[in-house]
Amino acid sequence: MSFFKNQLIHRARPGYRIIPESTVTEDIELGTIGEETPLLSEGVITAVEEGAIGLPEVAIGVAGAIGTHAHEWWRDRYAFKSVLTGNYTDLKGNPLKPRNAIPEKIKQLGKKIFQGDFNRAFPDNLKLETEKEKADLLRYYNHNRRLAGLSEAYPQGKGYAYAKSQKVLEAERRGLTVPGYKYLGPGNSLNRGQPINQIDEDAKEHDEAYDKVKTSQEVSRADNTFVNKALDHVVNAINFKETPGNAFGAAIGAIGIGTKQAIEKYSGVIYPSVSGMSRHINPRYINQPNWKDYIAEGNSKNWVGYSNLPDDFFQEETLSDSPMQEATKRKADSPAVETPAKKGTTGVNVNSQSTDPQNPSSSGATTDLDVTMAMSLPGTGSGTSSGGGNTQGQDVYIIPRPFSNFGKKLSTYTKSHKFMIFGLANNVIGPTGTGTTAVNRLLTTCLAEIPWQKLPLYMNQSEFDLLPPGSRVVECNVKVIFRTNRIAFETSSTVTKQATLNQISNVQTAIGLNKLGWGINRAFTAFQSDQPMIPTATTAPKYEPVTGDTGYRGMIADYYGADSTNDTAFGNAGNYPHHQVSSFTFLQNYYCMYQQTNQGTGGWPCLAEHLQQFDSKTVNNQCLIDVTYKPKMGLIKSPLNYKIIGQPTVKGTISVGDNLVNMRGAVVTNPPEATQNVAESTHNLTRNFPADLFNIYSDIEKSQVLHKGPWGHENPQIQPSVHIGIQAVPALTTGALLINSSPLNSWTDSMGYIDVMSSCTVMEAQPTHFPFSTEANTNPGNTIYRINLTPNSLTSAFNGLYGNGATLGNV
């Protein structure tokens, strides 16, 4: 690559206005910053200089581009002149006025103050010796701020530091594009936003294919695919099936690829610089001891101020015609090269990507760190190898290590349920209390529970049974859509009740009531005989099958039906699968506040503070709840085992340097706050798991029960509850309620209809480290242990966690 072409390509980086990185940039008026400047194709420059193609081929490509975007080319004609001549002007051709140079003292002061971050405000309270120094520092600040393109490219506070860390500026500057497009052109970044049109989308796919190729055959395949798509666009435009814009871009793209292929007939396949792939230092110089210190010094300065380097010092990565990667080939001995002592330095820039070993510029490059490490190994000195040949100048050959990537499979289970809920009235129920005895009291509500902590809401029995050991829920989501409500009234009753259609009805929603500890979910078993909206008796919530007169066939049978093979209930009348036929069924459990008499608590807390209420007439067919939860320990199948190896197999006592806090429990006794105690209890970890811990009805979140690894902290949590309800609607009567101060105890039959979209994501993996193991296995750190406690989620929470107290019986 000649000096002329090297400098022209360096200047022809598209993106923001081109200002060379030298002291001159601080002595000129910058003009407009942030406008895109289309420039000449690097491929065309190379072809013309080296004579790889003839003038007709060049003329076709250039003429096509000029004909399509003549306006843009004419508008930016002064930009081309600036690049080719080095005399920089603005977009109107006006010369950039010289300014007084900023003193070196101010530059060094600015570097210390701003440290490359010009997104911060200019510190007006700086105390300098003279006002001129402060003015010069402000010029330094404004220049670098404008040069970074902050005001145009990052107006939302994403300044220079952010852009530099994300390599945004480099991505926007990289490559060449046809004016009006983002990806149609060689060597572009893959992160330039949404394509302009379909041919621009095809060009992006072409660049993405380039990013993954490893052989020249794959390059040709990507080129041919793009050309075929481009020709299709042209044909479709002729037949009026597409807009002319696609045809223009397609013609330019096809001509460009054709020109590239013509060049490659003589030069071979040239790997384009896409997605961060750029030039690197030739390994033959890296491997020379007398170049090592010189290269390290150049890398530290990003090669600013270095010139007169050999023409092949920086090289583009080229592809082999063989599928074998370049890094695995052994090259012939390299001829002697000049040492850095024979080279001089001037102030001309050499723009090269960093060769920092932490961020290598290409997979085929070898850094000085790699060479140092390789030469320090026994038997790999700089002398002759075991075969007698000189290994100096060769790439390091790394032998691939065996590795099995078992991966993780993510499966998503989604169900759509239809439920009916009732506008139940508030009622205090419980036995009559006498004297100082603590008596249970429940205050019923209309809030029906969405059982999203249970697996049947997301999957049927077969889907659950087919999951392998170690499967766990990583995310679950429910969306609750309120469809409408129905208010019933009697039309043939006596004159004591009036029929009307304009009653007000409210919808209530709540998330996380279980964490309050104010109440529990209950299933209602009896209602007042003349008022069906008033519950009078409750029992424990129903999820699994419950026998008896007030039983329940369970969520699985309710939603998905019975097994036709061996389930005796399959043929029973009414036992049809509601989910399978998209039919309405009922939510079984409702939230009740819980209190005991004679405990000194002072009445019922304000539940309304934690409710969201809507006018039901305004939210028909609206999604009122959309909540997502990521379990901390969502294991739903038996955990993977580990295989104990090493001597001794019985490990004995291991010092872990800390208490095993995960094995502790808190015993909370004596409800009155004056005498309440919280004492510590210790429990051993075990690998013994109860049969019901991993059945389909167990809670998804198990971080209170299970622990990952033999020691360490777990910080358990519980899944927040989800409730929705229709507030009870009073019945209109002629009774003298106001005169006699009678309680409002007459309610209209009301019902609501909701749709529940439930979705959960399950992760599964089946790794093994042993060649003859018959089951998946893992290491001790990923092994799941159980704490010998059984929290009861049917009780109320204390400080955000469940205790192991007994379930409340029938009340």
From Swiss-Prot:
Residues 321-367 are annotated as: Disordered. One of its GO terms (molecular function) is phospholipase A2 activity. Capsid protein self-assembles to form an icosahedral capsid with a T=1 symmetry, about 22 nm in diameter, and consisting of 60 copies of size variants of the capsid proteins, which differ in the N-terminushe capsid encapsulates the genomic ssDNA. Capsid proteins are responsible for the attachment to host cell receptors. This attachment induces virion internalization predominantly through clathrin-dependent endocytosis. The gene is VP. It comes from the Viruses. GO terms for biological process: arachidonate secretion; clathrin-dependent endocytosis of virus by host cell; phospholipid metabolic process; symbiont entry into host cell via permeabilization of host membrane; virion attachment to host cell. Keywords: Capsid protein, Clathrin-mediated endocytosis of virus by host, Host-virus interaction, T=1 icosahedral capsid protein, Viral attachment to host cell, Viral penetration into host cytoplasm, Viral penetration via permeabilization of host membrane, Virion, Virus endocytosis by host, Virus entry into host cell. The N-terminus of VP1 is sequestered within the mature capsid. It contains a phospholipase A2-like region and putative nuclear localization signals. Residues 346-366 have a biased composition (Polar residues). It holds the Pfam family Phospholip_A2_4. This is Capsid protein VP1. Its main location: virion. SUPFAM superfamilies: ssDNA viruses. It is found in: Virion.
